[in-house]
């Protein structure tokens, strides 16, 4: 065997393995591992690939429903939408690389999630993202926003998939660890889904796509450790993406799938060739022999260690039907991509890697994954925070000035500056563009549409992880409902700090319990996801951020609702109960200067009952516009509806039973705003009363201003100018 470094405790630690984990390796293989084997174990046993801190808790998630074709465990989740069609989708993080090298980190995050989708045999039709940045005044924030947004747009636009929605937030807790969560959605034939499990002995294992370089080595390990002041030095571990190569890879993969060449397929993502080969073999209960001399490389003198751990982008591994090998090769050559037989399946259940005639690794394949450490880490529940009583909160300004301030804050202002850099209409199927509750994308040339959203409220999750987890799912369910969609399933991206700290693990466990309970109550299963831990720098963790990506179905996309008021003279109805909950509200934080209190409680039965009623109104054509209530509460939602349409509203005063600023800006859950024609208002209100659904008329659309009885009014154009100005001004250098 070639000269390799001697295995020392320092080398083991540098690979992110704890002493007890290394002892486990020694016991498992009965000898000291080679350097290449140490790298393989480091890749397969890190947090990013093994889920060793989270797996025990993830098992409790509801993952089944009659429409679920494939739940967690594959490259992406798959749901049946009827007519022989399936939706394939997943969300993943690229947090650590995006902080170090924002443009490349974001591009490869998009590229990786697109590969997860088309690996399953689906053509990508939409992307979304959830972005969390540090405080605007932090010296790195502008640079990170600029790089990440350019990277997402650069990759998606070049690849040719629309970016149709997302979330962006700013908070000082993300100063040292931004979050870049990318979601991709694709369409496939329900009976032509491709999986990762290899089958058959002595089947050719084929390397496809771009050449292997030294970029991304230990990328997965970097994503499994917290940052410190030396993190900038990790720039070489950030992968480099090429969207044009990925587009060629997509077309070549779909073509050989259509030609019935494929037994199994796995994209080379985290841990590259190592993870893809091990997963294919282990899932098929087979061994894998690899000959690295056959791997196409773009750099000279690459070692076995480097080739096995490279995370170069735009690469796939396939097990092909032997009789189809020549046909498959011709297809890939036509698209100008590398095609190389790099190994074979074996009955040995061992993972054997050869290079230059030497055996560089010989390991039990199933144990690489199945025997990874599994931790039930100590966790403590977050302390309960006191309920903030609205009558004890002094209003620092009048209602309309408070609204003007809120809509120009970093979290509530328009994100047009971001989404206008994304091509959100390419492919020609985008029905509802960014800026509303959920994006709506047409399903091919038929009448169906998909409702797509990404949601989470991290400040709620910090204050009460259980309620915050429930609320993230409930808001995704509401956003899909508000456009007329029937919520079908979610993908989650669970972003947390260091799980070795009991309080952080407590946040994770609490959020997961809330997510599980909400998914069960709303019949909204989890079909795919990703866990990103160690999101902290120098011991300062991010806010717990379990991003929820939701997918819903519209049988007729023309019967969707938008947030824009449709006409003047229509009745504005508030559906759901309003108590004026100010705890953890944006108003309390950004107007009153208090980030405190318990978040609003989530009533899942009310969410289901009220959401079903609103969806029925949209389908019946009764509702002319609809909007769910979330950040900023009632008046911010009304302002958004007015700004989207250019039509004002005349609003009744707050009821005497609720403090005015709590009524207008409280963030009670399970609420919607709906407009109906004046001729329908009485009938709808009577029907709601009969059904026991809280529903109140709060005003009438019309005019050019938002006017509250007994308060000042403000022109909609004035609001829109403030709403649209903050982000472009900030990115242009304004304080």
From Swiss-Prot:
<comment type="similarity">
    <text>Belongs to the FGAMS family.</text>
</comment>
<dbReference type="Pfam" id="PF02769">
    <property type="entry name" value="AIRS_C"/>
</dbReference>
<protein>
    <recommendedName>
        <fullName>Phosphoribosylformylglycinamidine synthase subunit PurL</fullName>
        <ecNumber>6.3.5.3</ecNumber>
    </recommendedName>
</protein>
<dbReference type="Pfam" id="PF18072">
    <property type="entry name" value="FGAR-AT_linker"/>
</dbReference>
<dbReference type="GO" id="GO:0005524">
    <property type="term" value="F:ATP binding"/>
</dbReference>
<comment type="pathway">
    <text>Purine metabolism; IMP biosynthesis via de novo pathway; 5-amino-1-(5-phospho-D-ribosyl)imidazole from N(2)-formyl-N(1)-(5-phospho-D-ribosyl)glycinamide: step 1/2.</text>
</comment>
<dbReference type="GO" id="GO:0005737">
    <property type="term" value="C:cytoplasm"/>
</dbReference>
<comment type="subunit">
    <text>Monomer. Part of the FGAM synthase complex composed of 1 PurL, 1 PurQ and 2 PurS subunits.</text>
</comment>
<feature type="binding site">
    <location>
        <position position="529"/>
    </location>
    <ligand>
        <name>ATP</name>
    </ligand>
</feature>
<dbReference type="InterPro" id="IPR010918">
    <property type="entry name" value="PurM-like_C_dom"/>
</dbReference>
<feature type="binding site">
    <location>
        <position position="92"/>
    </location>
    <ligand>
        <name>Mg(2+) 1</name>
    </ligand>
</feature>
<dbReference type="GO" id="GO:0004642">
    <property type="term" value="F:phosphoribosylformylglycinamidine synthase activity"/>
</dbReference>
<dbReference type="InterPro" id="IPR016188">
    <property type="entry name" value="PurM-like_N"/>
</dbReference>
<feature type="active site" description="Proton acceptor">
    <location>
        <position position="94"/>
    </location>
</feature>
<keyword id="KW-0067">ATP-binding</keyword>
<keyword id="KW-0460">Magnesium</keyword>
<keyword id="KW-0963">Cytoplasm</keyword>
<keyword id="KW-0436">Ligase</keyword>
<feature type="binding site">
    <location>
        <begin position="93"/>
        <end position="96"/>
    </location>
    <ligand>
        <name>substrate</name>
    </ligand>
</feature>
<comment type="function">
    <text>Part of the phosphoribosylformylglycinamidine synthase complex involved in the purines biosynthetic pathway. Catalyzes the ATP-dependent conversion of formylglycinamide ribonucleotide (FGAR) and glutamine to yield formylglycinamidine ribonucleotide (FGAM) and glutamate. The FGAM synthase complex is composed of three subunits. PurQ produces an ammonia molecule by converting glutamine to glutamate. PurL transfers the ammonia molecule to FGAR to form FGAM in an ATP-dependent manner.</text>
</comment>
<dbReference type="GO" id="GO:0000287">
    <property type="term" value="F:magnesium ion binding"/>
</dbReference>
<feature type="binding site">
    <location>
        <position position="115"/>
    </location>
    <ligand>
        <name>substrate</name>
    </ligand>
</feature>
<dbReference type="Pfam" id="PF00586">
    <property type="entry name" value="AIRS"/>
</dbReference>
<feature type="binding site">
    <location>
        <position position="492"/>
    </location>
    <ligand>
        <name>ATP</name>
    </ligand>
</feature>
<dbReference type="GO" id="GO:0006189">
    <property type="term" value="P:'de novo' IMP biosynthetic process"/>
</dbReference>
<feature type="binding site">
    <location>
        <begin position="311"/>
        <end position="313"/>
    </location>
    <ligand>
        <name>substrate</name>
    </ligand>
</feature>
<dbReference type="InterPro" id="IPR036676">
    <property type="entry name" value="PurM-like_C_sf"/>
</dbReference>
<feature type="binding site">
    <location>
        <position position="116"/>
    </location>
    <ligand>
        <name>Mg(2+) 2</name>
    </ligand>
</feature>
<keyword id="KW-0658">Purine biosynthesis</keyword>
<dbReference type="InterPro" id="IPR010074">
    <property type="entry name" value="PRibForGlyAmidine_synth_PurL"/>
</dbReference>
<dbReference type="InterPro" id="IPR041609">
    <property type="entry name" value="PurL_linker"/>
</dbReference>
<feature type="binding site">
    <location>
        <position position="532"/>
    </location>
    <ligand>
        <name>substrate</name>
    </ligand>
</feature>
<feature type="binding site">
    <location>
        <position position="51"/>
    </location>
    <ligand>
        <name>ATP</name>
    </ligand>
</feature>
<dbReference type="InterPro" id="IPR036921">
    <property type="entry name" value="PurM-like_N_sf"/>
</dbReference>
<feature type="binding site">
    <location>
        <position position="267"/>
    </location>
    <ligand>
        <name>Mg(2+) 2</name>
    </ligand>
</feature>
<feature type="binding site">
    <location>
        <position position="90"/>
    </location>
    <ligand>
        <name>ATP</name>
    </ligand>
</feature>
<feature type="binding site">
    <location>
        <position position="530"/>
    </location>
    <ligand>
        <name>Mg(2+) 1</name>
    </ligand>
</feature>
<keyword id="KW-0547">Nucleotide-binding</keyword>
<keyword id="KW-0479">Metal-binding</keyword>
<feature type="binding site">
    <location>
        <position position="239"/>
    </location>
    <ligand>
        <name>substrate</name>
    </ligand>
</feature>
<feature type="active site">
    <location>
        <position position="48"/>
    </location>
</feature>
